[in-house]
């Protein structure tokens, strides 16, 4: 996937850039800021670079350049779109923007005289893992979350007045959740016996396709069956943003919050009407107030969730973390429940600390279509319908581009035009009160068919069960040779009784020609054993919804805490000696004057002193006991002549424990088991 490259372009001398003695520059040296994992588990991202001050030579020679102050600030900017209320809240610039300082560096705290040339100052910061990613929210894209590095310098050249220079560099922060095992979901649709099994990936990406495996089971029962007619899918994005007001208009926001709370209480007394959304339906914007009972966005008790709830066949997917826990592992289940309870309590505390609980919710459909073919139906036994399809998300653009790594006052950053942003990756930030979730909704329309024979005779329950298991064999036996290619007519017979009667007459005519004989009563025995289905006019809509985790691709990078630290040898100064250097002397001595002879694992190694002169190695022979009842272990026993001695590491054989061998009449030295298992000595 290729992103349009953003470069820092500009004209030298524009906006008075040529008459300044001091030029500022920002250069990012660290990899792109990618937060790996969910907000509760992410280790953050490292941001490091250089801020440069270039003093022109002419200004320095004229009287010197004194930099009074040079600061660098990393700030988070949240621009709120329309608050959907008239009055000062919609027109106040302070209410529409919120700034938060994440880090601050006093590069030059006191006045300092700088010589002509380039001066570089490094900086670094660890971005917290719970920060929201750079995002554009809503259908209009007016609400945005951005990060910027702002360099501010105040200088005085040649004894003149103080002048100020400012430089901004946008910092792109993205979040990537690594893909795990696919999720298997099971849905049940009472009062029918139909069950749906879906297989979905754990995470999805913008500008990609989502594989979906769907299987319907239990579509055949007794004398009826369900035939799939259409499948409709859509992806809904739910955005919830807490309203923001400046200190001057905070009282007006509280009054608006009380009005919305009273209106919500009145609406709760009325029966909720479900909203039937379609793929071509526009965004739906609602205003709500968070309470202690409903602190989290998109809970079952929220207004938007109650309106979209359908008690018939809606089944929310469970938390993705529970899919990795074995049902019998109660300890891990309890630990997960405690963790979720703590997170919920923290979010409750965050809600209570906030000055307002007024939220703006927007629900929109970002993708969806209908599928009318492509599945396979098998009506043998209990029956099943299988479908494997690709959900197209290639038109979804999250606005992520290549990051800008270098800007300067002579070449400032100018944003180029790009494709409109129509999707936002998942965001969960209780501090800002911003939440973005995605749901995949699947609706399957199945039509009911009544099974009967081609002559119109209905099936009893016992016959239907017997025919369901051996329907293929019965059809093969009853089908004449002349109708071997009438599969298309059989499909038409399942659609309408008129085609069934036509096929029945054709089958009888062919059966009379190919039948070897008739029954005593003049009727054929297997001519009318074919089973067809006739639509009854009844249909059901099977609705399912699955929670999707939309995230950016991780790329080739890894988290900073997963990187391998440098070795001692890679640090050029004050590093301790390596292992090889410490034992090089002993290794050289051992390699020139020692050998090791050992038996299998069942026998301890036998060491005997060996002469230092390069003589013929001692003969190794098998003793007479090797052919006894001890087996292979005894056959592998090696005996060393008493004239030889073996030693390791320059140790004297006298220090080793001696064992008398009565059968051979000489002494051998045996090492301890702990010394035999010393891998360092063995490798040396």
Curated annotation (Swiss-Prot):
Protein name in UniProt: Protein LDB19
Biased composition (Low complexity): 593-602
Cysteine pairs bridged by disulfides in the record: none
Function statement: May be involved in protein-linked oligosaccharide phosphorylation.
Compartments where located: Cytoplasm; Golgi apparatus
Keyword match Cytoplasm: yes
Single GO MF annotation: ubiquitin protein ligase binding
Location of the region described as Disordered in the Swiss-Prot/TrEMBL record: 462-483, 510-531, 593-632
Keywords assigned: Cytoplasm, Golgi apparatus
Bilayer-spanning residue ranges: none
Main location: cytoplasm
GO (cellular component) term, any one: cytoplasm
Lineage of producing organism: Eukaryota, Fungi, Dikarya, Ascomycota, Saccharomycotina
Sequence similarity: Belongs to the LDB19 family.
Keyword tRNA processing annotated: no
GO biological process: cellular response to amino acid stimulus; cellular response to stress; positive regulation of receptor internalization; ubiquitin-dependent endocytosis
């Amino acid at each position: 996937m290729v992103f349009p490259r953003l470069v820092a372009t500009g004209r030298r001398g524009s906006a008075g850039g040529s008459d300044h003695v001091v030029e500022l520059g920002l250069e990012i040296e660290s990899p792109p800021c990618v937060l790996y994992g969910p907000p509760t588990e992410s280790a953050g991202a490292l941001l490091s670079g250089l801020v440069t001050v270039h003093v022109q030579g002419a200004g320095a020679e004229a009287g010197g350049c004194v930099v009074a102050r040079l600061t660098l600030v990393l700030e988070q900017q949240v621009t709120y779109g329309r608050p959907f209320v008239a009055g000062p809240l919609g027109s106040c610039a302070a209410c529409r923007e919120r700034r938060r300082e994440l880090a601050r560096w006093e590069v030059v705290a006191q006045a300092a005289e700088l010589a002509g040339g380039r001066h570089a100052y490094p900086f670094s910061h660890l971005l917290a893992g719970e920060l929201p990613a750079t995002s554009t929210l809503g259908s209009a894209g007016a609400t945005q979350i951005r990060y910027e590095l702002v360099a501010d310098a105040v200088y005085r050249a040649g004894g003149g007045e103080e002048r100020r220079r400012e430089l901004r560099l946008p910092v792109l922060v993205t979040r990537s959740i690594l893909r795990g095992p696919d999720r298997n979901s099971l849905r049940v649709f009472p009062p029918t016996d139909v069950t749906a099994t879906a297989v979905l990936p754990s995470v999805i990406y913008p500008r990609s396709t989502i594989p979906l495996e769907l299987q319907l089971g239990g579509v055949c029962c007794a004398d009826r069956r369900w035939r799939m007619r259409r499948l409709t899918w859509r992806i809904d994005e739910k955005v919830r943003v807490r309203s923001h007001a400046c200190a001057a208009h905070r009282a007006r926001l509280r009054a608006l919050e009380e009005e919305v709370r009273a209106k919500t209480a009145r609406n709760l007394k009325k029966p909720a009407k479900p909203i039937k959304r379609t793929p071509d339906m526009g965004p739906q914007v609602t205003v709500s107030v968070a309470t202690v009972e409903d602190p989290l966005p998109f809970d079952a008790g929220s207004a938007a969730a109650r309106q979209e709830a359908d008690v018939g066949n809606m089944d929310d997917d469970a938390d993705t973390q529970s899919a990795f826990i074995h049902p019998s592992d109660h300890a891990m289940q309890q630990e997960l429940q405690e963790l979720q309870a703590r997170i919920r309590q923290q979010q409750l505390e965050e809600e209570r600390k906030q000055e307002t609980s007024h939220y703006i919710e927007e629900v929109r459909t970002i993708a969806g279509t209908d599928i009318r073919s492509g599945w396979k139906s098998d009506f043998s036994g209990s029956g099943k319908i299988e479908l494997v399809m690709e959900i197209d998300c290639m038109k979804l653009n999250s606005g992520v581009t290549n990051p800008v790594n270098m800007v300067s006052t002579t070449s400032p950053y100018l944003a180029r035009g790009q494709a409109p942003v129509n999707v936002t990756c998942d965001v969960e930030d209780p501090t800002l009160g911003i939440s973005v979730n995605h749901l995949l909704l699947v609706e399957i329309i199945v039509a009911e068919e009544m099974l009967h024979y081609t002559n119109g005779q209905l099936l009893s329950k016992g016959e239907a069960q017997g025919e369901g298991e051996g329907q293929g064999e019965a059809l093969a036996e009853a089908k004449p040779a002349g109708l071997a290619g009438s599969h298309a007519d059989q499909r038409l017979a399942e659609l309408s009784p008129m085609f069934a009667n036509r096929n029945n007459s054709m089958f009888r005519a062919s059966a009379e020609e190919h039948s070897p004989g008739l029954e005593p009563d003049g009727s054929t025995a297997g001519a009318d054993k074919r089973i067809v289905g006739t639509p009854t006019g009844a249909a059901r809509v099977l609705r399912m919804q699955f929670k999707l985790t939309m995230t950016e691709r991780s790329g080739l990078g890894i988290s900073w805490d997963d990187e391998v630290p440098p070795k001692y040898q890679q640090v050029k100064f004050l590093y301790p000696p390596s292992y090889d250097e410490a034992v090089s002397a002993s290794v050289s001595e051992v390699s020139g004057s020692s050998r090791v002879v050992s038996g299998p694992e069942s026998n301890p190694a036998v060491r005997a002193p060996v002469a230092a002169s390069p003589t013929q190695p001692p003969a190794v022979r098998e003793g007479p006991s090797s052919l006894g009842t001890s087996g292979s272990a005894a056959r592998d026993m090696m005996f060393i002549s008493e004239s030889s001695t073996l030693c390791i590491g320059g140790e004297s054989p006298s220090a080793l424990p001696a064992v008398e061998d009565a059968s051979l009449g000489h002494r051998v030295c045996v090492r301890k088991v702990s010394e035999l298992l010393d891998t360092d000595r063995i490798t040396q």
